């Protein structure tokens, strides 16, 4: 297995953050990202970049972090107990975008690299990441295009890659207590190292580079769609699912909190406004019911 080049991965991630922020600013056309660099007492640091109250995006956060530690946290060793006691480095770019317009989906993307080392032993490393889409008022053409782009990203790496990571995404972004998916999925991968460093890194780069290719056309198509208070209230209600998933199930959030990560950056994914409603049930045949009936369960889109 080829030797990991940590510096090359870090350089790519910093550049990716810059390029995604530039692309999102261009899509918004009004607001700009404020950068907030931070250091972590236990080792490492990062830069959080947040755009708020834009013409298109109510809030968009794009975070780069590179943290180091002397021992692995419980969230990372739960399914890899052999890694307990190793020092680690974790780096990645993570983003969440909450648009103003309920007809534009919320989206999340993340690419990351993890390496754990111990004197006298080979390093253990892997890549992870993916992206997923959470519409409020979905359009089938948007969802199909999103998944076609996902499939195109995976194609050079083998025909089995897209179905595998699409299925993993559907399974990961699932709320058992609601019995529904968080959205319409995309790609999710983790523990990627079996093809060696170069090939694994290439796939992670393809996913990171492909995110805006998948998302930008949907934003452009829907950003002028008119909406009213009904759509806004439903958007705020459905954002509650995002909060529930991230605080209860998301491994990245739990890892960050357990490793003493920067709380503001970890919770950057939270929507700026959200609401809950007791025992909400959409009206039969309504656009809101369409989301529940046709989109919040795994489907083959391409």
From Swiss-Prot:
Catalytic reaction(s) noted: coproporphyrinogen III + O2 + 2 H(+) = protoporphyrinogen IX + 2 CO2 + 2 H2O
Compartment annotation: Cytoplasm
Binding site for a divalent metal cation: 98, 108, 147, 177
Segments of this protein annotated with the region Important for dimerization: 242-277
GO molecular function terms attached to this record: coproporphyrinogen oxidase activity; metal ion binding; protein homodimerization activity
Main location: cytoplasm
Catalytic residues of the enzyme: 108 (proton donor)
Keyword Protease: no
Subunit structure: Homodimer.
UniProt-recorded name of the protein: Oxygen-dependent coproporphyrinogen-III oxidase
Organism: Shewanella sp. (strain W3-18-1)
